[in-house]
Amino acid sequence: AIAANQNRIPLAKMAVEETGMGVVEDKVIKNHYAAEYVYNKYKDVKTCGVLEQDDNYGIKKIAEPIGVIAAVIPTTNPTSTAIFKTLISLKTRNGIIISPHPRAKKSTIEAAKIVLEAAVKAGAPEGIISWIDVPSLELTNLLMQSADIILATGGPGMVKAAYSSGKPALGVGPGNTPAVIDETADIVLAVNSIIHSKTFDNGMICASEQSVIVSDKIYEQVRNEFMKRGCYLLNAEQTEKVRKTIIINGALNAKIVGQSAYTIAKLAGIDVDENIKILVGEVESVELSEEFAHEKLSPVLAMYKASSFDDALSKAYRLIEDGGLGHTSSLYINTVTEKEKIEKFYNTMKTCRVLINTPSSQGGIGDIYNFKLAPSLTLGCGSWGGNS
């Protein structure tokens, strides 16, 4: 963990240089989080041997390593995910074989090497951490079929392949996180939090907000706050241009992932200021036929108007059902006066993380906005998302 943390800056630079995605400063933070926060949380947790013993009832709870973990690493968070998965594997005495994304193999392997060298120096077996030097779909599938358990972080296709491998799998699929802003919400807090979350590493954390659903009673105020804070509200013609840039041939356009709002606007043929933070498209449909209703992994945000709280719930439910089952949902609301609405929200959302008045990128991964939520860069989606 110390070795990984000491290399957080060069690893961040390497990841951005290799992939052409994200923000160096934010990747430094992610690497630090993956090493420091995870170590501090789990260093004193017993993971093997006798975990519990009750002599009165004659019961012992014993944990054993699973064996070899297949770790699929995404191009969006290569070094931080590699650090996280190798550390938790070492902590549980499991071997791990990493399958990097072809676009991020150099930085992913470098992160794994740093952790391996430090682990071996500390007495771990040689080869406890391994990787595929020349990654391919065939080798990744072979690895998943051969391992004892799979930790799969990646696109829907990769996660589906992990679930179809015949081995236990913990998959991190698409997020498509909706953020509902209730009429009782603190508007400045809500908008600032969403911008803070959505711009972090150019929107590549899978828990980041993909859509914002706003009560019609405060819609104009929220709209104005976004503009005041440096976001760009697209007009109808510009919205159509960005639509054609988000989805290409039925899939997310890789050219927009982790790019700045200015770069994406240029790709769409729209002239905006270089310092624009987020491109906001005001749309109506939450169906998959609406490109803005998809997960975008970039500083592009869909904005919906809700006629009531139930309408907002219905829209959020549909967005999750189509593109983010089991992942994350977010609500901005007065927590003192609106307890019934909050209860209705978390009972309706089929997500493992329901965040209240919290930036979803930073809040979803734990130990930042809520210290009781364990830190993790693998945000599993539970039974809703098909996890084992």
What are these regions, as identified by a protein language model?
Residues 6, 10, 64, 84, ...:
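Conserved active-site and cofactor/substrate-binding residues in soluble primary-metabolism enzymes
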Residues 1-2, 103-104, 132-133, 209-211, ...:
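Conserved short loop/turn motifs at secondary-structure junctions
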Residues 67-71, 87-88, 94-97, 127-130, ...:
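Structural motif
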Residues 1, 270-388:
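Conserved C-terminal structural/oligomerization subdomain of aldehyde/semialdehyde dehydrogenase
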Residues 1-15, 19-23, 112-123, 147-151, ...:
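Structural signal for hydrophobic packing residues in well-ordered secondary-structure cores
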